Amino acid sequence: METVRIIYVRDNQTLKTVFVDRDGTINRDCPYCHELDDLQIYDDTVGILKHYQGKGYRIIIVTNQSGIGRGYFSMEEFRRFNDGVVNRLLDLGVKVSATYFCPHRPDEGCSCRKPGIGLINEALSDFRVDIGGSLVIGDRDDVDGQLARNLGLPFRIVSH
């Protein structure tokens, strides 16, 4: 298994980008979320994302999904749930350009698992990003905050 991407909107513009965590940041974090019945979007995060989108930022989700590597849910189940998240955000006025996710278990030592920068490197290969004007948003300083520090980017923590 390798880093996987789902690109929803491709563009050729160089844009500042919000790299945002999914579980616990955009939606309620349930153990190995993959059922649409469990999907609960946080309104405050939607407001934050709409703020940045209104200032011209691109929105990209970056998320660790070890439930795939552990066999708790399939790649298809992940995609269905993630599409549900992205579609709900779109209904609420937030356009997500892509999702980059690490399907590996933490003990596999991959280069894509946050707080490593592999997911961001993949995004940089697919999109033209004004990295100096970009930021990371997440709910965990030890993962999302460390990702931001590894990239030299600002970090905005959310808590619910």
Swiss-Prot record:
Query: Can you tell me which residues bind substrate?
Result: 21-23, 29-32, 63-66, 113-114
Alphabetically, the GO molecular function entries are:
D-glycero-beta-D-manno-heptose 1,7-bisphosphate 7-phosphatase activity; magnesium ion binding; zinc ion binding
Task: Just give the chief location class.
Answer: cytoplasm
Instruction: List the catalytic residues.
Output: 21 (nucleophile), 23 (proton donor)
Name the needed cofactors: Mg(2+); Zn(2+)
Residues annotated as site: Contributes to substrate recognition: 113
* Site (Stabilizes the phosphoryl group) residue list: 63, 114
Recorded GO CC terms: cytoplasm
Where found? Cytoplasm
Q: Does the keyword Hydrolase apply?
A: yes
> In terms of domain of life, where is this protein from?
Archaea
One example of a Gene Ontology biological process annotation: carbohydrate metabolic process
The record's section on NCBIfam families has: HAD-SF-IIIA, Histidinol-ppas
Query: What is the designated name of this protein?
Result: Probable D-glycero-D-manno-heptose-1,7-bisphosphate 7-phosphatase
Q: Which organism is it from?
A: Thermoplasma acidophilum (strain ATCC 25905 / DSM 1728 / JCM 9062 / NBRC 15155 / AMRC-C165)
